Amino acid sequence: MVLFGSMQAVSNVAPPVELERSRAVAIMRRTDPKLACETVEALLAGGMQAIEVTFNSPGAVDMLRAIDQAFGARVLLGAGTVLDADEAEAALDNGARFIVSPHTDADLVASLARRGVACIPGALSATEVLAAWRAGASVVKLFPAGSVGVGYLKDLRGPLTDIPLLPTGGVTLDNAEAFIAAGAWGLGLGSALVDPRLVSERRFDELAERASVFVRIAARAHRAA
């Protein structure tokens, strides 16, 4: 007699080497396409390796393609805010090497995992985190991390010790070190790093310096692993 049902497990795809090493993702959300390549250059100068272009950015597909053509293997390019299979396919066709979502679509995660594509789905509760991991996630994005805080991540890490968590949404210079100390696998960095004002005012030296600070903080997660 079967007492408990079970979902067939999907093997988790390892994070790309660049992300495993750097433990940080720079998120370009609604960045001016005309300034995209300069923004990427500044992030690379600051030591960032993984850069995510969100799919709700104007001209996201064209931006992915332009960055891929301009930088090639110099950047680990990903697509974020991917909501369905069509968007994931378009992203992969235009240079993305990993997929990030604000939610967990188990079918999409499993489909990408079976193809060997790294996927970082979003989750908040313990139930969602476990579902994302069992679907085949490479890393689980804890979102929105800033709203629940460092203590929440630490509490999740208690029962879910072996699931890598990437706090995203509200990660800043004020709390980044605390997230790492609480057991975060790495950091998802939005406007606290890719500040729209720095980009629009072409203050790329400041952007590079800010990136270097976050890179040093995130590196502590790799050393602690």
Task: Give the location of each predicted region.
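Conserved N-terminal beta1-alpha1 strand-loop-helix module at the mouth
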Residues: 2-97, 104, 114, 162, ...
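Conserved beta-strand positions in the central sheet of alpha/beta enzyme cores
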Residues: 52, 100, 120, 139-141, ...
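Short secondary-structure boundary segments
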Residues: 55, 81, 102-104, 123-124, ...
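Hydrophobic, well-structured mid-protein blocks that either form specific transmembrane helices
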Residues: 89-132
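Glycine-rich phosphate-binding active-site loops on the catalytic face of alpha/beta enzymes
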Residues: 102-108, 142-149, 184-203
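Anionic-ligand binding region
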Residues: 125-138, 150-152, 156
